[in-house]
Amino acid sequence: MALRGSHRLEVIFKRCIASPVLHSQAGNRRSSQLAIKGVDPNSNGNSGQYQQNGEHKEKGWRRLVRFFVPFSLGAAVSAAIIQREDLTPTIAASKMTGRRRDFNFIADVVAGCADSVVYIEIKDTRHFDYFSGQPITASNGSGFIIEQNGLILTNAHVVINKPHTMVQVRLSDGRTFPATIEDVDQTSDLATLRIQVNNLSVMRLGKSSTLRSGEWVVALGSPLALSNTVTAGVISSTQRASQELGLRNRDINYLQTDAAITFGNSGGPLVNLDGEAIGVNSMKVTAGISFAIPIDYVKVFLERAAEKRKKGSAYKTGYPVKRYMGITMLTLTPDILFELKSRSQNMPSNLTHGVLVWKVIVGSPAHSGGLQPGDIVTHINKKEIKNSSDVYDALADNSKTLDIVILRGVKQMHVTITPEDP
């Protein structure tokens, strides 16, 4: 900018020197001065007169330079400032506005499907809030509307195995409705709810079979009752077998993503960039490792449930749970242990097996006994726990209490839990 300004000043100055108007004005002043002194302006004159004329000429140019240079420099600087203030912000703002419009694809996805995402609360009817007098929230999760007449899809672990509770659903517009559990498949961890309201926004279902690793996805839900919370990431794997996750009785290849799936958005939709649900958010192992149930498996569950409803019965499958402890858990397979140890320094290096407590239901026996999310169960009643099946076997035992050995970070602890009958 400084070079361009000085160049302009030089050009303007040269033009002024060569200007016939300025030459004419300077000549007229010189002729007038010589005429007053009685000197012929057209004569050559003597050397003294010539020297005097030269001095007059030199003084005239000095006046011109003293007047013109500061004026020209100020004009050039002012023009540069005006150009910078008037043009630069306009161009920058125009470019940024275009980027927001062209590249904010995540916001476009959310705007198209957020209205179909709901918040699910499990209320404990035995315990009441001191101030409001309402049942306390024992658990929460998310779901999404799949039919306009109030059918909602979620995870089974969000709504079942919670005795003495009631289910409430809050829509994106703030309205709250009681809900009934219609269909449950504990094997695939899927369930449907029904609320008595019509003309709802419906989530479109896509195809998980066409997904590729590296595709962008968006996880929607309501963690901690914060409606329409959004996390984004990519598909890390489309074929993560349930055996790798230590999930028993499940023949499912899960979707793995680095989009954060938490307690609150569990049961919510995992959406592609077309705004279609391609999975149901299921669980998070650690930062950057979360899993979702592919929507193709969900469609099979929904078809079977619809057939059952036509016959006047509900679709309910899964293994029976004789007693209730109140946790969601995940078997620590060698692959998961490797990932956990590589991401956290609080994992004991000699740990080779166990069950990770992923979620603890408020007010449950596990919560009352002191279990916390992130604890690792290694023994129950002195029996080694290698997978989630061992925990279910311990619950099926007739022991009144469960003496559980856990790892909380690198510290080993004992907790005692008294399971409840469902």
UniProtKB/Swiss-Prot annotation:
Record's subcellular location: Mitochondrion intermembrane space; Mitochondrion membrane
Cytoplasm found in the keyword field: no
Annotated catalysed reactions: Cleavage of non-polar aliphatic amino-acids at the P1 position, with a preference for Val, Ile and Met. At the P2 and P3 positions, Arg is selected most strongly with a secondary preference for other hydrophilic residues
Region (Serine protease): 139-302
InterPro entries: PDZ (IPR001478), PDZ_6 (IPR041489), PDZ_sf (IPR036034), Peptidase_S1_PA (IPR009003), Peptidase_S1C (IPR001940)
Gene3D superfamilies, per database record: 2.30.42.10, 2.40.10.120
Residues of the signal peptide: none
EC number: 3.4.21.108
Transmembrane stretches, start-end: 64-82
Active-site annotation: H157 (charge relay system), D189 (charge relay system), S266 (charge relay system)
Gene Ontology terms: cellular component: cytosol; mitochondrial intermembrane space; mitochondrial membrane; Nebenkern
Region: Disordered, residue numbers: 28-55
Membrane topology field: Single-pass membrane protein
Removed propeptide positions: 18-74
Enzyme class: hydrolase
Residue interval of the organelle targeting sequence: 1-17
Comp. bias (Low complexity): 42-53
Keywords: Apoptosis, Hydrolase, Membrane, Mitochondrion, Protease, Serine protease, Transit peptide, Transmembrane, Transmembrane helix, Zymogen
A molecular function (GO) term: serine-type endopeptidase activity
Cited SMART domains: PDZ
Domain PDZ residues, every copy: 325-410
Major localisation: mitochondrion
Record flagged with keyword Protease: yes
Entry function: Serine protease that shows proteolytic activity against a non-specific substrate beta-casein. Promotes or induces cell death either by direct binding to and inhibition of BIRC proteins (also called inhibitor of apoptosis proteins, IAPs), leading to an increase in caspase activity, or by a BIRC inhibition-independent, caspase-independent and serine protease activity-dependent mechanism. Can antagonize antiapoptotic activity of th/Diap1 by directly inducing the degradation of th/Diap1.
Family of this protein: Belongs to the peptidase S1C family.
Protein name: Serine protease HTRA2, mitochondrial
Organism of derivation: Drosophila sechellia
